[in-house]
C-alpha cells in the first residue's frame, strides 16, 4: 500500500494548545479533542456543541445537531471517567428532554463524584484532597464547565471487540509511543488478561510508520473482529482507514515530540477510547489530550571517548590500600593479571612509592611525565562521600579521558540522591563545553573486563572467580546494569567468553544506549548482550535506534529487562537507582527494533552462548531435525518448536536420509527399537557413534536447516563423564561424542 495522503493542519492544532495554555490548562476538553482530530485528517469526528453552565440555549441550538438521539457528557477539568459518575446520558433529541437531562447532570454528577472520591480517597485529584461532604461536592460543582451535546452515531455492532482504542503517550524512556487494540471501558482488563500482543500492541512512533504499525496490529484480536475474520462477524472498517489513522497519530506524535527541537508543545497523552464504526466510518466516542511545554534537550555526551575507556593506554587508580586487600587493591591486581603493563598504571596514594610494583604519586597534579598530565582511564575506588570533590578535580585538571566510578551511595537511596545530582550537574556542565570533558561509567559499578584492552577492573578476587586470562575470547560484549548479574552468568556458564564485560551501574553519565551504539560501530563485536533494569530519560529510544542499526549491520542483540512486575520494579529502584518503565512498552519497542528478548535469566544465558558460538554460521531457514537418546526429551523437543516469540518447523526427511538412517539402525541393531521420525528417539542403547552419524545424516539433508542433538548423560552406552577411571565412560575418549 502507498503511504496515506494526509493533510494535518499543525498550525490549527498548535493554536488549540496555545488557547488552552493561555487559560492555564495543560489539557484539552473533549470537544477540543474532536477539533484536533478534524485538523489531523480524520474523516468523521462527531458534531458537538458545548452548553456552558448557566447558559439558556434555544430550541434551535439544541436541535442543530442531527440524529434521533442526543449524547450529553459532563465537561470538567477533573473528571476523567465520566461514565462511572453518571456523566454520560443518551436521551431523545427533543429540547425538553435535553434540558432536563442537562440540568439533572449538573447536580447529580458532583454528588456522585464526591461519593466516589470518599470511597477512593487516594485517587482524588489534588484539588479535592482533604475535602468531604458538601464542601467536596460544592468544589466539584464549581469546576464544571458545562455539558457537551454530541451527535449520536449508532455503531454497526455492540458485540465484544467492535470498539477500538488508539492512543499516544509520551514515555520517559522511549519518547512517543503509539498503542492500539480492544477499546471500551474494559480496555485495562483486556490488556491484563489476554496473551501478550493479543489485546493491545504498542510501538515507538520514531521507529515505525502507519503500514508497519498496521502489520503489528493485524496480530490482535481487535483486528480479527474489525476485519470480520471471526465467526458471525462482518468487516466494519477497511485496512486503509486503519493505516491512515495510525499514520496520522504517528505524524502528530513526532511533530509534538520531546525529540523534536522545534516542537511548540509536547503531547503527553492523546487517547481516543473508543472509536466505534458506523457504515464504514470511524467515529470517536470519547477523547482526551494532555500536553506540556517543550523542555531543553539533554547535553550530548562525548561518547567517542568510550574507546579510551575500553582500550586505555594508561590507567590511574585511587583508593588502593598499601596494607590490606580492599576493592582498590583487588582491582589493581586484576588489571595486572590481565596483562596491562605496570609502567602504564599509576596509583594516587600519598606516602607510598610503589604498591605491587606500580608507581604511586601523591595527587592528580603529580601524574608521571610520560602521561602528559592525563590518563585514558581513571578508576575511582574511594567512598561515595569523596566522589563530588574528586570529580571536580578530575574535570578541572582535565586529568582523564574516561572515569570509572566504583562506589555505590550515588543515587540508590533518598539520602544519596543529592550527592548524585551534584555530580551529574557537574558532569553535564563540562559536557556542554567545547572540550566536552571525560565520560563517566557508573556509579555503583563493578567494573569492566576488556580482553582487547588487556585489563580487568572487577573488584572480585581471583580466588573467588578464577578467570581464563589471555586472548581466548569471542567477538561478543556483555553490557549489564547489574554487576552481580554479569558475575553469575560467567560463574554459572564459564563457556561464555565475551571480549568485553561492562558493568553500567547507575548510568550517572554513560548510558545503555551509548554503550550499545559504540558496539554497533565496533569492528571487534558481532554479538551484544544487554541486561537492563531501567533507562535514563529518552535513552530507551536511543537504545532502540542503536539496536535497529546493529541488527541491520548483521549483528545479534540479546536483551533481558528486569522490573517486569510491580514488585520487580520496586526491587530494581533500590538496586542501581534505575527507574523501571512500563515493561510492555519496553518489550514491544526493543523487539520491533530487532533484538532477541529473553524471558528468563537462564534463557538469556543460553541464547548468549548460542549467539557467541553460532553467529558466523549461515542458517538458511527454520526447518529443524532433532535426535535424542531419551524419549521424554524427544517429545519435549517437538513440544517446544512454537512460542509467542518464535516458530520452527520439524523437517521432512529426504528419501536418501531415510535410507541412511535405516541402514545405520540395522547396523547398530536398533531397527527393532527405533523408528524413523522427527524428532528421533534413538534409545538409551545408542552409543556415541550412533548419535554422531544420525546427526551427520540429518545435516546432509537439503530439507534440514539445523539439527538439535540431545545427549543422555546417564546412558551406559555414552562417554559423558569428565572424571572417571572407566574408559568406556570418559568424555575425552577418542570414541566419545565430544571429540567428534
Residue ranges and their predicted role:
Residues 1-740:
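Catalytic-core regions of core metabolic enzymes
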Amino acid at each position: 500500500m502507498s503511504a496515506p495522503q494526509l493533510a494535518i493542519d499543525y498550525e490549527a492544532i498548535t493554536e488549540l494548545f496555545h488557547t488552552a495554555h493561555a487559560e492555564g490548562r495543560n489539557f484539552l476538553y473533549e470537544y477540543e479533542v474532536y477539533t484536533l482530530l478534524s485538523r489531523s485528517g480524520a474523516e468523521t469526528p462527531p458534531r458537538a456543541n458545548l452548553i456552558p453552565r448557566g447558559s439558556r440555549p434555544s430550541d434551535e441550538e439544541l436541535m442543530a445537531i442531527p440524529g434521533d438521539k442526543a449524547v450529553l457528557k459532563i465537561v470538567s477539568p477533573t473528571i476523567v471517567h465520566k461514565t462511572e459518575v453518571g456523566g454520560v446520558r443518551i436521551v431523545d433529541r427533543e429540547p425538553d428532554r435535553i434540558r432536563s437531562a442537562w440540568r439533572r447532570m449538573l447536580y447529580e454528577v458532583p454528588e456522585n463524584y464526591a461519593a466516589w472520591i470518599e470511597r477512593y480517597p487516594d485517587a482524588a485529584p489534588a484539588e479535592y484532597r482533604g475535602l468531604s461532604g458538601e464542601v467536596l461536592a460544592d468544589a466539584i460543582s464549581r469546576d464544571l464547565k458545562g455539558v457537551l451535546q454530541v451527535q449520536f452515531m449508532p455503531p454497526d455492532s455492540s458485540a465484544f471487540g467492535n470498539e477500538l482504542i488508539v492512543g499516544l503517550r509520551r514515555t520517559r524512556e522511549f519518547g512517543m509511543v503509539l498503542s492500539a487494540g480492544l477499546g471500551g471501558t474494559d480496555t485495562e482488563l483486556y490488556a491484563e488478561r489476554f496473551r501478550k500482543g493479543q489485546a493491545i500492541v504498542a510501538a515507538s512512533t520514531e521507529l515505525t510508520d502507519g503500514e508497519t504499525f498496521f502489520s503489528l496490529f493485524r496480530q490482535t484480536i481487535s483486528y480479527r473482529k474489525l476485519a470480520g475474520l471471526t465467526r458471525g462477524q462482518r468487516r466494519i472498517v477497511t485496512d486503509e482507514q486503519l493505516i491512515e489513522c495510525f499514520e496520522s497519530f504517528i505524524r502528530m506524535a513526532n511533530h509534538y515530540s520531546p525529540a523534536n527541537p522545534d516542537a511548540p508543545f509536547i503531547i503527553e497523552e492523546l487517547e481516543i477510547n473508543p472509536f466505534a464504526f458506523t457504515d464504514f466510518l470511524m467515529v470517536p466516542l470519547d477523547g482526551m489530550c494532555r500536553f506540556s511545554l517543550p523542555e531543553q534537550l539533554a547535553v550530548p555526551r562525548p561518547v567517542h571517548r568510550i574507546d579510551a575507556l575500553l582500550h586505555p593506554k594508561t590507567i590511574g587508580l585511587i583508593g588502593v590500600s598499601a596494607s590490606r586487600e580492599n576493592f582498590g587493591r583487588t582491582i589493581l591486581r586484576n588489571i595486572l593479571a590481565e596483562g596491562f603493563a605496570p609502567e602504564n598504571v599509576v596509583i594516587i596514594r600519598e606516602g607510598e612509592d610503589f604498591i605491587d610494583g606500580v608507581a604511586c604519586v601523591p595527587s592528580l597534579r603529580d601524574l608521571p611525565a610520560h602521561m602528559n598530565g592525563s590518563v585514558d582511564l581513571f578508576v575511582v575506588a574511594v567512598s561515595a562521600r569523596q566522589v563530588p570533590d574528586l570529580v571536580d578535580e578530575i574535570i578541572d585538571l582535565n586529568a582523564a579521558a574516561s572515569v570509572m566510578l566504583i562506589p555505590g551511595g550515588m543515587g540508590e537511596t533518598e539520602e544519596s540522591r543529592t550527592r548524585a545530582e551534584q555530580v551529574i550537574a557537574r558532569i553535564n556542565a563540562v559536557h556542554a563545553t567545547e572540550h566536552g570533558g571525560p565520560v563517566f561509567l557508573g556509579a555503583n559499578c563493578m567494573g569492566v573486563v576488556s580482553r582487547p584492552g588487556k585489563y580487568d577492573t572487577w573488584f572480585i578476587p581471583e580466588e573467588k572467580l578464577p578467570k581464563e586470562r589471555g586472548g581466548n575470547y569471542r567477538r561478543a560484549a556483555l553490557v549489564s546494569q547489574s554487576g552481580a548479574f554479569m558475575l553469575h552468568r560467567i560463574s554459572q556458564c564459564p563457556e561464555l567468553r565475551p571480549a568485553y564485560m561492562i558493568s553500567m551501574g547507575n548510568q550517572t553519565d554513560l548510558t545503555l544506549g551509548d554503550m550499545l551504539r559504540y558496539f554497533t560501530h565496533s569492528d571487534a563485536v558481532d554479538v551484544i548482550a544487554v541486561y537492563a533494569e531501567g533507562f535514563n530519560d529518552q535513552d530507551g529510544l536511543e537504545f532502540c535506534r542503536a539496536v535497529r542499526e546493529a541488527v541491520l549491520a548483521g549483528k545479534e542483540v540479546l536483551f533481558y529487562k528486569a522490573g517486569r512486575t510491580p514488585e520487580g520494579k520496586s526491587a530494581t529502584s533500590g538496586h542501581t537507582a534505575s527507574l523501571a518503565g512500563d515493561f510492555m512498552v519496553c518489550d514491544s519497542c526493543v523487539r520491533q527494533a530487532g533484538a532477541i528478548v529473553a524471558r528468563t535469566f537462564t534463557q538469556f544465558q543460553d541464547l548468549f552462548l548460542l549467539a557467541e558460538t553460532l553467529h558466523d554460521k549461515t542458517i538458511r531457514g527454520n526447518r529443524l531435525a532433532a535426535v535424542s537418546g531419551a524419549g521424554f526429551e524427544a517429545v519435549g523437543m517437538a513440544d517446544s518448536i512454537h512460542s509467542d516469540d518464535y516458530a520452527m518447523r520439524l523437517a521432512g526427511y529426504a528419501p536418501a536420509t531415510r535410507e541412511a538412517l535405516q541402514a545405520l539402525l540395522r547396523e547398530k541393531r536398533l531397527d527393532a527399537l527405533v523408528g524413523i521420525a522427527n524428532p528421533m528417539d534413538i534409545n538409551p542403547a545408542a552409543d556415541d557413534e550412533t548419535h554422531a552419524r544420525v546427526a551427520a545424516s540429518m545435516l546432509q539433508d537439503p530439507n534440514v536447516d539445523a539439527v538439535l542433538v540431545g545427549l543422555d548423560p546417564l546412558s551406559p552406552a555414552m562417554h559423558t563423564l569428565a572424571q572417571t577411571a572407566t574408559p568406556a565412560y570418559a568424555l575425552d575418549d577418542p570414541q566419545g561424542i565430544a571429540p567428534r
